[in-house]
Design a protein with these regions (language model features):
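Charged, low-complexity helical/coil segments in non-catalytic cytosolic or luminal regions
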Residues: 265-346
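Bacterial N-terminal signal peptides that target proteins for export
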Residues: 1-9
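Short, flexible beta-strand-to-coil junctions
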Residues: 249-251, 281, 350-355
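A short, surface-exposed interaction/processing loop segment used at functional sites
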Residues: 138-169, 173, 270-303, 360-371
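Preferential activation on post-signal-peptide N-terminal prodomains/segments
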Residues: 22-265
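C-terminal motif of bacterial Sec signal peptides marking the signal peptidase cleavage site
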Residues: 17-21
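Low-complexity, Gly/Ser/Thr/Pro-rich intrinsically disordered linker/tail segments
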Residues: 339-359
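Conserved histidines in hydrophobic membrane contexts and catalytic metal-binding motifs
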Residues: 185, 277, 347-351, 367
Length: 371
């Protein structure tokens, strides 16, 4: 598995929060109309031009520290956005029972905790070995089969164990099509009254047996306990194919950050938002739902800075870093990034440096790096 990203993150501690970037760059854009430009004349006019003609890919090597070979996943026609108060989920136990009703007959009991809070305890009539936990703001379902899949697959780039790129997304398994697996996941969220927060397209990965075995062999080398765990589940013969479906959450078409993130300067860890499902021939093996949703609007609509401004700001963050080669950006998107109280829009840049990938976020209003 990959080494820790900690050395990369520590670099950012020495960087001050940076204001809007530097000079003009000529950028090669795919699927960008000939009269559109990322070079601002007036900030508002450029913003409208850019956001209405957002490219699907950027290929640019003219920056000082950054090289862009990046897919761009940003909605068109977004010129203004709000800051929202940050709310936790509120998953009602009755809704959980309804969501599982096509698959399991559940019962629940709400119990109090020593600190004055409460949590919901569920149990199934026909599967008393399944683990179901809900604190209203977080929900987990896991049966006995799920543990190996969960340990052998990781889509969260906030962790060094990320390996989702090793799994294909375009293969149907014999027992269920990809579309049917996605529908199962979305129907579950509909029953929890989360339909309006689902961001499309959802992510789907096919956990083929061959790739799972490859990941298992690598994991056993790195973690000898994995072999003991494998034996407790019945050995390699018990490894079976499944789908992993991830459903991001969104606010008015802009996804909420779905990877784990830590504010280095304030030591504030922030969980990703969304719903994860592992679906095998026997049905749901694993479900985890958590993160944040919008509350009330915290600020009125504000102008979003242009993509070029955000790219310049990103390049500027590396001025104090000694680089042996340019940092490569492979994906650009727009996210709502949570802090302690709010959800703030930011450009997310997926960077690759020395074989490691991580997200860097630039505030979509100020052009400052979120660290």
């Amino acid at each position: 598995m990959k080494n820790s990203l900690t050395p990369l993150i520590i670099i950012f501690i020495v960087l001050c929060t940076l204001c809007l970037g530097c000079g003009d760059k000529n950028i090669e854009l795919e699927e960008l109309s000939s009269d559109a430009s990322l070079n601002p004349v007036s900030s508002h006019d450029a913003l409208v031009s850019v956001m209405q003609s957002m490219p699907s890919h950027i290929l640019e090597s003219g920056f000082e520290n950054i090289r862009f070979d990046a897919d761009v996943v940003i909605p068109d026609n977004l010129t203004q956005l709000n800051i929202w108060n940050r709310n936790l989920l509120d998953i009602k136990p009755g809704s959980v029972v309804a969501a599982f009703s096509p698959h399991l007959n559940l019962n629940f009991e709400t119990r109090s905790t020593n600190d004055g809070g409460y949590f919901d305890m569920f149990w199934a009539d026909n599967d008393n070995k399944a683990i179901i936990r809900s604190w209203r703001w977080s929900f987990v379902f896991e049966n006995e089969q799920a543990e190996l899949h969960r340990l052998l697959f990781n889509r969260d780039r906030g962790y060094s164990q990320y390996n989702a790129d090793s799994f294909l997304a375009d293969i149907d398994l014999p027992f269920l099509s990809r579309e049917e697996a996605q529908d199962m996941a979305k129907e579950f969220l509909y029953a929890l009254d989360l339909r309006s927060y689902i961001f499309e397209p959802v992510e789907l990965y096919t956990l083929s047996k061959s790739q799972l075995m490859e990941e298992l062999d690598e994991e056993i080398v790195d973690n000898p306990y994995m072999e003991t765990l494998l034996k407790s589940h019945g050995g390699k013969e018990t490894i079976h194919e499944a789908y992993f479906v991830f459903v991001p959450f969104q606010i008015n078409g802009v996804p909420i950050m779905s990877d784990t993130f830590s504010y280095v300067t304030a030591d504030i860890p922030v969980r990703g938002s969304g719903a994860s499902f592992i679906i095998s021939e026997s049905g749901f093996e694993y479900i985890e739902i958590g993160g944040y949703l919008p509350g009330d609007v915290q600020s009125p609509l504000q102008d979003v800075i242009s993509l070029e401004t955000a790219m310049n700001a990103l390049d500027k963050t590396y001025d104090l870093v000694l680089l042996s080669e340019p940092v490569v950006v492979t994906k650009i998107t727009l996210y709502y990034v949570p802090n302690a109280t709010a959800l703030t829009p930011a450009y997310g840049f997926l960077i690759n440096q020395n074989g490691f990938s991580m997200w860097v976020y630039i505030n979509a209003f100020t052009g400052e790096q979120i660290i």
